[in-house]
Amino acid sequence: MKTLYTNAVVYDGGRFAAGEFAVDGGCVVPAGGVADRVVDLGGRHVVPGLVDVHVHLREPGFSQKETIATGTAAAARGGYTTVCSMPNLNPAPDTPQTLRAQTDIIRRDAVVRVVPYGCITMGQRGCGRLVDFAALAPEVVGFSDDGRGVQSEGLMEEAMRRAAQVGKPVVAHCEVDDLLRGGYIHDGEYCRAHGHKGICSESEWRQVERDIALAEKTGCQYHVCHVSTRESVELVRRAKDRGLRVSCETAPHYLLLCDEDLQEDGRFKMNPPLRSRADRDALLAGITDGTIEVIATDHAPHTAAEKSRGLAASAMGVVGLECAFTLLYKYMVLPGIVTLEKLVALMAVNPRRIFGLGGGLHVGDQADFTVLDLDARYRVDPATFLSMGRATPFAGWEVQGRAAMTVVGGREVFRDETMKTNR
């Protein structure tokens, strides 16, 4: 059945223009000709479906925190049509058999596209034996031990060689264990003033530096997870200037908060931690000049009990799928820090290009798109989240703009209750 979407402001080739588009058989088709169904979008903006390359869906193994059903429902509500699932699961996806434990649930329960990562090391331990990259490659978007840094330089070099051979990226959580020293927030003024244990910036950037050298040596495509320090940004900038296949992401909380905003509350605890104002400024500069090409949420839900133990004892991780776009639109687009077009590139276009993912608004694409209501205003209320996780440092923030409709493969998977269309 052909559906014609009219009265829209459509993102195309880096700009918005008034227009219409059509979907048939799950794909975008030419708008001309007779349509079986017409949907008037009321002048709303339409963008390629958002893509989050860093999500913890927790299933299998930790369904008390999140399930694939609840996590992907949250993603759809946030405007995401594709999410990439991190491998810190039980069983960890380190063989085709253990990966299948996850993909079977994805096929049954997911409402958006879920593309899994395979582990780098067996058991996702960050050490020991490497996985069989060739065996996992057909079913994964890349290889990661997110949550752990691969400590051995030799092991990481061999991992990059094997990943390069199968044409997949290494997606690295960069953290030198020997530099952590029991820390859990940034080693800055707040940490020292309140008697906490700090995580130094070098624990991140030192491993980024090592890995970039290995990526250059092996020819591997290399992506840095959740950069948080100014040194990491500069290292990636220099690597890109040299033409290396290096990319990186950061998350909304690192762009909108710093350690000056910390409270004695587990909602403010994540890894890497909120860094200094100077680090945040460097991240914003990296967004502006294109060094940072991706914004990902690092959606990491935990139970209420796990997040209720203060900064020292709470589990690390916050949720982000349902409010990432609306926060960034309110606090980065509206003040003129980035354009809406730039934000769409960071949250939809660039992740697809870097990770070779499908879906979009061009004729022939899988019809994955998000309809945005840029006038919607509300407060972030974790009690209304579809995710099982409730811990966000943005609770109570006033926001503007949100997904009014999310469509995956031509199928509507989310519609905001305020969204009305003429059919």
Regions found by a protein language model. Give the residues of each.
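Histidine-rich, glycine-flanked metal-binding segment
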Residues: 1-49, 420
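Divalent metal-coordination and catalytic microenvironments
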Residues: 8, 26, 43, 54, ...
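C-terminal cap of metal-dependent C-N hydrolases
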Residues: 8, 310-313, 363-423
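Metal-associated gating/positioning segment near the N- to mid-region
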Residues: 44-109
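Active-site mouth loops of central-metabolism enzymes
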Residues: 53-66, 115-128, 147, 196-201
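Alpha-helix-loop-beta-strand connector modules within alpha/beta enzyme cores
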Residues: 96-113, 162-172, 323, 327
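Histidine/acidic residue-rich metal-binding segments in metalloenzymes
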Residues: 128-295
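His/Asp/Glu-enriched, well-ordered alpha-helical/loop segment
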Residues: 193-221, 288-289, 293-295, 300-374
